Amino acid sequence: MARTKSLSRQIRLARATRGMSVAQVAENVGVTPVSIYYWESGRVRPRDRNLSQLCKVLRLPVRETMALTGR
């Protein structure tokens, strides 16, 4: 649970730092805005493929971000 909260916090902070809306991130990742909301709330963890794309879009370190998923 703590990892999920850390991941959701990291996603939300990176998006805000980049000045991107939920809709912009969703479009660039190839998912719905609802998915981004769920990831940011910690309700759902992104699948590996989506997390990899999210890292590219938000310029997050892939290895460290993947570690937050517990995978």
What does each model-identified segment do?
Residues R9, G19-M20, P46-R49:
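Residue-level signal for the short linker/turn that defines the boundary of a DNA-recognition helix
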Residues G19-Y38:
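Short alpha-helical DNA-recognition segment
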Residues M1-K5, A23, P61, R71:
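N-terminal flexible/basic segments that precede or flank functional cores
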Residues M1-T17:
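A short, Lys/Arg-rich alpha-helix, primarily the initiator
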Residues R12, Y37-Y38, M66:
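Key DNA-contacting residues within the recognition helix of helix-turn-helix
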Residues G30, R49-T65:
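DNA major-groove recognition helix of helix-turn-helix/homeodomain DNA-binding modules
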